[in-house]
Amino acid sequence: PDASLTHPQADQDAPRPSTTWAIMVHGMGATRAETLRALDATQALGLTSLHMSYRNDREAPASEDGRYGLGFTEWRDVDVAIDYALTHGARDVVLFGWSMGGSISLQTADLARNRRAIRALVLDGPALDWLELIQYHTHLNKLPLTIGQLGVKMISHPALTSFTGLKEPINLTRISWPHRADDITRPTLILHSTDDLFVPYQPSARLAELSPLVDFVPFTGASHTREWNIDPERWTTTVTRWLTDTLAGPQPQG
């Protein structure tokens, strides 16, 4: 994947650079610019930020099939980004993920060979339950329920990849996190607007109810992944305080 770095400010009021890096993962259809919203928080904490691209996002090289994997495939690119951080001075990392980037980040924490280096996750408007999200958009677009069910089957069935163009089927249950709350192993902060009409907030709230490692902070009045735009001071303060407390705690195990 391609990436750009933002180092902590080199002025006397800034904190000493941390050996914890922030790995920023944008959402579907967005670019690395989406992740710049987190810079006030990471700069305040002295974190180096790596703003990465991933397969098929129009900045990184495309995969063989040229298709998004909804987090099922892209996590491998985050693992490579963590490799880079660990070989350039980082001892551990915090994953930031917006929208589908949230799904990618959770898959990374679950599957990556570098997962032990992940201290925490900060997710903004994350897509956490793809089964529910597909049905939601089926209803939103006034399509028959069977259309959504067919879409799920086409994406997930090995025999139908020739119709979808996917190199491999996507196991949607594996990336529907309220069904896998017990598999959350890292402290996770979720910021999600209750007025998000593209990726509804309910799975985020539900995951926080099901996992003691997940903290959910609702926003109001913001469209999808625009929580920072509505109230940048609250967003930055929430993330900074939460990460300060989390990074001061013990290193997660497993």
Residue ranges, per PLM feature:
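Catalytic histidine-centered segment of alpha/beta-hydrolase-like enzymes
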Residues: 222-236
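Conserved alpha/beta-hydrolase "acid-adjacent" motif
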Residues: 197-203
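Short, surface-exposed "cap/lid" segments of acyl-processing enzymes
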Residues: 7-8, 13-61
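Catalytic nucleophile-loop/oxyanion-hole region of alpha/beta-hydrolase
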Residues: 57-89
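Short beta-strand/loop motif that positions the catalytic acidic residue
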Residues: 183-185, 190-192, 196
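Gly/Ala-rich beta-loop-alpha elbow adjacent to hydrolase catalytic centers
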Residues: 96-101, 105
